């Protein structure tokens, strides 16, 4: 077993009271610190308090200690061990030090996974969380944003959420009205992290086709041809984006053409939706720009 201890700290040009007030909003609806939507938000099953359970993404933990305005410790859920903690330390001159510590006992396999895959992403997520503290707390704002390493970018791309198959949503009224009797329909869905756009117009770049109809939460794209017509619906509902495709063939040539295309269609739909999802997440403003900072 190896003891992994990972420490990040930064001096913030703001009082510990200001930074502590930001810390107390972690995991709330107006959380100004979680580096979402590029990273999964920190979510708990209740208010920030000892005993609250939650995590970010697939990392699960519970609040084992909480000193309001001063620090939080999260213990990893079994079978994992160890903890990670975020603390504010007062300094002279109306400044403070923010420190994040992760400590865990790891076997060889876990250590290799941590070293090669998880650590670059962990380092980046923590530094971006501290970036948000500096953005929100310091009168001069963020001096120098953290720069991602190549490995962190690669690993984040690899583990980015993948679309899941779903039925055509009932709320996708434009898709349902597109054709009276479509010959094909499918739908792929991704969750929307806090900070991602909820306006369907922001998602029109998923497919480079003509806008056929719009609704408050749905955008319908499509093209018509002599052999087939197709429509693609982008629906925003229940904190998810859903890409629905419906196709109507007109003749034998259309049926033969789509018999070939449908083999590649699921892959291309997932690829384009996932690519747009990632692009819009990186383009979103940071949390302090979306919430009212406590000063």
Q: Where on the chain are the PLM-derived regions?
A:
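Short, highly charged C-terminal tails/helix-capping segments
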Residues: 131-162, 277-295
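A short, structured loop/turn motif at beta-sheet edges
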Residues: 13-17, 64-69, 87-97, 214-216, ...
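Mature, function-bearing regions of proteins
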Residues: 209-217, 230
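Well-ordered alpha/beta subsegment
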Residues: 262-282
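Hydrophobic ligand-binding cavity/cleft-lining segments
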Residues: 1-44, 143-210
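Short, hydrophobic/aromatic-rich segments at coil-to-beta transitions
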Residues: 42-51, 66-74, 214-220
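Hydrophobic pocket/interface hotspot
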Residues: 19-29, 63, 74, 98-100, ...
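Beta-strand/loop substructures that line and gate deep hydrophobic ligand-binding cavities in soluble
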Residues: 76-135, 142-144, 226-262
């Amino acid at each position: 077993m190896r003891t992994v201890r990972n420490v990040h700290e930064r001096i913030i040009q703001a009082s510990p009271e200001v930074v502590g007030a930001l810390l107390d909003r972690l995991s709330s609806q107006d959380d100004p610190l979680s580096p979402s939507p590029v990273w999964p938000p920190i979510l708990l099953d209740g208010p920030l308090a000892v005993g609250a359970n939650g995590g970010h993404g697939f990392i699960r933990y519970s609040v084992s200690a909480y000193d309001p305005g001063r620090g939080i410790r999260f213990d990893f859920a079994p079978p994992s061990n160890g903890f990670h903690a975020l603390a504010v330390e007062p300094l002279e001159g109306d400044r403070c030090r923010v420190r994040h510590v992760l400590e865990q006992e790891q076997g060889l396999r876990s250590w290799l996974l941590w070293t090669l895959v998880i650590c670059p992403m962990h380092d980046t997520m923590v530094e971006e969380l501290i970036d948000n503290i500096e953005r929100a707390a310091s009168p001069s704002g963020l001096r120098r944003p953290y720069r991602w390493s190549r490995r962190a970018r690669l690993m984040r791309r690899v583990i980015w959420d993948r679309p899941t198959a779903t039925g055509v949503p009932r709320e996708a009224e434009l898709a349902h009205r597109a054709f009276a009797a479509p010959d094909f329909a499918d739908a792929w869905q991704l969750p929307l992290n806090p900070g991602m756009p909820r306006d369907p117009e922001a998602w029109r770049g998923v497919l480079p086709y003509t806008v056929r109809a719009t609704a408050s939460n749905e955008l319908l794209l499509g093209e018509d041809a002599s052999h087939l017509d197709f429509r693609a619906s982008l629906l925003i509902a229940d904190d998810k984006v859903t890409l629905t495709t419906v196709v109507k063939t007109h003749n034998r040539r259309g049926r033969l053409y789509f018999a070939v295309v449908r083999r590649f269609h699921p892959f291309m739909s997932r690829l384009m939706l996932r690519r747009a999802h990632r692009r819009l997440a990186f383009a979103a403003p940071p949390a302090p720009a979306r919430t009212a900072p406590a000063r």
